[in-house]
Structures are given as structure tokens and as C-alpha cells.
């Protein structure tokens, strides 16, 4: 499949740095703002800490490293495909090729790509981050997130994914004036199972995003109202 591309972001890119474990992006106005992943990770920090305690530090590190490698490889292959570039499968593990093969019918529902692995920011929200994809999915413009997981997770566990996608939708609108219709998460497992989560209740997730931001700001500045 050949994907059509349209670029409304120009050559936008931002410098970034790490400070006290928080990734910061330098906006065009000179402000340094946190990444959306720093905010969502902070909001879910206790869940992650409880999991590490339950399975043990060594096992948690092993699982995290394995998941990170799997996700990075799958994203790299998907990005090449979406950019209409040839994938040299000798550069990837067999598992990546297997997972990509099962995800491909769902990837082929994407077209008219606005962004693939692009940095977005919002001065209004004071955040920035890197979106997997903004494109039409089954004919409707969407923020599209590619996720790998050992098994398909229940939707109730994925709130932070949808909140992060909502930020990208908000930032893209702020930067371009273009509104996305929906939030799409394509999740694929090492066993080849694929699940697509399609969220359209954007108002709910913008409210959650504000809550995430306020808690993050309160923790890092001591401000009661997150301002």
C-alpha cells in the first residue's frame, strides 16, 4: 500500500533535555515544558510502583526492558511502512516481523497521513510530546497510537493512553486549526492478537488531561490549584 501524506506542521522540531527524571521541551517562545509522557507516568506512578514491588525489582526490570525493545522495534518497522519505505527484515527480530504481519491489515486502514513520529506542543496546556501518527483511520482523522503488549489489556486499564492521545489532538488543533474526530489505539501482542480501541468521547479525556496536569504541577511546584 502507498500512503498519501500531507504536512501542516512544516519543519517543526523542538530541543529537549532531562531534568530530575522529567523530559522537557523548549518551545518557540523560550519556555521549557514537560512532556506528556512525564505527566501521564507521574499520574500512574503508584500503580507502577506497586507492580514493581509485587513482581520484584529484577523481574520488573527484565519485563520492562523486553517490552521497551519490542515496542521500539515495532514502531520502527511501522514508521518505515507508513513512510512508504522498504523494510529490510534482516534488521529486525523475527517477532517484530510476525507482529507487523498481523497488524498490517489494520495499518492498511490508515491513509492521508498528517504526521508520523512528529513533535507537537501546546502553549495553552504547557506540554509537548511526540505523536506516533495523525492520519485518517477508516476515512476519519484520528490520533493513532501503536502499542505492543504481552496480552490485550482491558480498556479500563488504558485511560492514560487515551489521555495522552487527547493531548496530541489538542496540540495539533492549536498548531494547525485542524480537529481530529477520534482517538485510535492499535494494540498487538507477540501472539499476533490485534485489538483496536476507538474513542470519540474527547470531552471526557480533555477533562482528565487537565486533572493529570494539575496533579503533576501541584507535586512539582506545591501549587494547590495546579496553576
Annotate each PLM feature.
Residues 115-222:
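Mg2+/Mn2+-dependent nuclease catalytic core
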Amino acid at each position: 500500500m502507498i500512503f498519501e501524506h500531507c504536512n501542516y506542521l512544516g519543519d517543526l522540531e523542538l530541543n529537549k533535555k532531562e531534568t530530575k527524571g522529567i523530559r522537557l521541551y523548549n518551545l518557540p517562545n523560550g519556555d521549557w515544558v514537560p512532556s506528556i509522557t512525564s505527566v501521564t507516568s507521574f499520574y500512574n506512578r503508584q500503580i507502577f510502583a506497586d507492580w514493581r514491588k509485587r513482581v520484584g525489582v529484577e523481574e520488573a526490570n527484565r519485563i520492562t526492558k523486553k517490552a521497551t525493545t519490542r515496542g521500539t522495534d515495532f514502531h520502527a518497522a511501522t514508521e518505515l511502512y507508513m513512510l512508504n519505505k522498504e523494510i529490510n527484515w534482516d534488521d529486525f527480530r523475527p517477532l517484530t516481523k510476525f507482529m507487523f504481519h498481523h497488524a498490517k491489515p489494520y495499518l492498511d486502514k490508515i491513509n492521508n497521513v498528517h504526521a508520523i513520529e512528529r513533535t507537537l506542543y501546546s502553549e495553552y496546556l504547557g506540554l509537548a510530546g511526540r505523536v506516533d501518527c495523525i492520519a485518517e483511520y477508516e476515512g476519519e482523522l484520528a490520533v493513532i497510537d501503536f502499542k505492543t503488549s504481552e496480552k490485550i489489556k482491558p480498556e479500563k486499564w488504558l485511560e492514560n493512553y487515551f489521555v495522552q492521545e487527547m493531548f496530541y489532538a489538542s496540540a495539533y488543533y492549536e498548531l494547525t486549526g485542524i480537529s481530529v474526530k477520534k482517538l485510535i489505539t492499535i494494540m498487538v501482542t507477540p501472539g499476533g492478537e490485534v485489538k483496536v480501541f476507538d474513542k470519540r468521547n474527547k470531552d471526557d479525556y480533555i477533562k482528565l488531561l487537565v486533572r493529570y496536569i494539575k496533579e503533576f504541577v501541584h507535586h512539582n511546584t506545591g501549587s494547590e490549584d495546579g496553576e
